[in-house]
């Protein structure tokens, strides 16, 4: 229903317009307060790069963050990552992730980034505090924030926006009548726009999410998705249909598609009934970090990696490296 409203296919968005006007007014006043100095942003002693979006829902920010961390590491630059930690409920914040940190504490995306990259990661609703605890423990060269474009309390040196190239901005309205956190005109003030799938416009950086082999949660075995019989797919991400479409493009024959809420907490009680012993369950890597502790032998996940082409990604990396020098 939300997808239909935000795409403009349902007239119900008209009923939500008063709330959207209020959202736009409040968010605009907040930005104005920072712009004219009524509110002040905290500036970290190292460069800060924000990877965010203008819309609610999954656009592919986390794969971009992972790509940036890995690419900078290959060039000798140590990046740390901060996040709000959506879906996590730690006893106290800020929280510096360790190998024992759970998704219940830190949220799924920070744990995924930590496990994939090995980079220092800290979470807190106050991202400035997350940066401070991160820097106190790790002498990183640069900080990347996973989301936080609208968190103006943290000063930033570069802003990168990730857009879903298929959905773009939906009906173009602010939340809740539409998907927008800020208006599309905000793109004129950011440093780079990365478009995930679809068609990139002039000046934008095209990106694709490339899947690899499916990985068994229990054993680590790898198989081609097309070789997994009796397959049931589940996805607790911002836009589950994208994951299901990716599986089908890999040759999967899905017996069922189960969309879940983004950042939804998962337990054995939630997941185990989704498949029989004769079926295989496949999920996103973001869901896998929540399920690994109670995984079954017929549960798999599909890793994806951001892939770029052309010279623009390298130019972006050069810009980030110049901040450190």
From Swiss-Prot:
Pathway: Glycolipid biosynthesis; lipid IV(A) biosynthesis; lipid IV(A) from (3R)-3-hydroxytetradecanoyl-[acyl-carrier-protein] and UDP-N-acetyl-alpha-D-glucosamine: step 6/6
SUPFAM superfamilies found in the cross-reference section: P-loop containing nucleoside triphosphate hydrolases (SSF52540)
The keyword Kinase is assigned to this record: yes
GO cellular component terms, semicolon-separated: plasma membrane
GO biological process: lipid A biosynthetic process; lipopolysaccharide core region biosynthetic process
Keywords noted in UniProt: ATP-binding, Kinase, Lipid A biosynthesis, Lipid biosynthesis, Lipid metabolism, Nucleotide-binding, Transferase
Record has Electron transport as a keyword: no
EC numbers for this chain: 2.7.1.130
GO molecular function: ATP binding; tetraacyldisaccharide 4'-kinase activity
Top-level EC class: transferase
Binding site for ATP: 55-62
Reaction catalyzed: a lipid A disaccharide + ATP = a lipid IVA + ADP + H(+)
Classification via InterPro entries: LpxK (IPR003758), P-loop_NTPase (IPR027417)
NCBIfam families to which the protein is assigned, alphabetical: lpxK
HAMAP family (alphabetical): LpxK (MF_00409)
Function: Transfers the gamma-phosphate of ATP to the 4'-position of a tetraacyldisaccharide 1-phosphate intermediate (termed DS-1-P) to form tetraacyldisaccharide 1,4'-bis-phosphate (lipid IVA).
UniProt record similarity statement: Belongs to the LpxK family.
Descriptive protein name: Tetraacyldisaccharide 4'-kinase
Lineage: Bacteria, Pseudomonadati, Pseudomonadota, Gammaproteobacteria, Enterobacterales
Gene responsible for this protein: lpxK
């Amino acid at each position: 229903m939300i997808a239909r409203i935000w795409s403009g296919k349902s007239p119900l968005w008209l009923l939500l317009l008063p709330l959207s006007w209020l959202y736009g007014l409040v968010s605009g006043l907040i930005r104005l307060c920072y712009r004219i100095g009524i509110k002040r942003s905290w500036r970290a002693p190292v460069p800060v790069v924000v990877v965010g979006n203008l819309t609610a829902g999954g656009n592919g920010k986390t794969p971009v963050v992972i790509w940036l961390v890995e690419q900078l590491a290959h060039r000798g630059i140590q990046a740390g990552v901060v996040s709000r930690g959506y879906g996590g409920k730690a006893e106290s914040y800020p929280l510096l992730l360790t190998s024992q940190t759970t998704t219940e504490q830190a949220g799924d995306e920070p744990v995924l980034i930590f496990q994939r990259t090995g980079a220092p990661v800290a979470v807190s609703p106050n991202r400035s505090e997350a940066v401070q605890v991160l820097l106190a423990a790790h002498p990183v060269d640069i900080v990347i924030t996973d989301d936080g474009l609208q968190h103006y309390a943290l000063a930033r040196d570069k802003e990168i926006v990730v857009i879903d190239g298929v959905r773009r901005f939906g009906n173009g309205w602010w939340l809740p009548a539409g998907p927008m956190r800020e208006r599309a005109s905000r793109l004129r003030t950011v440093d780079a726009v990365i478009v995930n799938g679809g068609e990139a416009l002039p000046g934008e950086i095209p990106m694709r999410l490339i899947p690899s082999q499916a990985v068994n949660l229990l054993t680590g075995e790898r198989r081609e998705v097309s070789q997994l019989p009796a397959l049931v797919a589940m996805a607790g991400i911002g836009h589950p249909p994208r994951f299901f479409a990716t599986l089908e493009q890999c040759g999967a024959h899905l017996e069922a598609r189960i969309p879940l809420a983004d950042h939804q907490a998962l337990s054995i009680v939630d997941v185990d009934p989704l498949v029989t012993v004769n079926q295989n369950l496949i999920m996103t890597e973001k869901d896998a970090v929540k399920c690994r502790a109670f995984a079954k032998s017929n549960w798999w996940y599909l890793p994806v990696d951001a892939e770029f082409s052309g010279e623009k990604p390298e130019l972006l990396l050069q810009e980030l490296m110049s901040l450190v020098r």
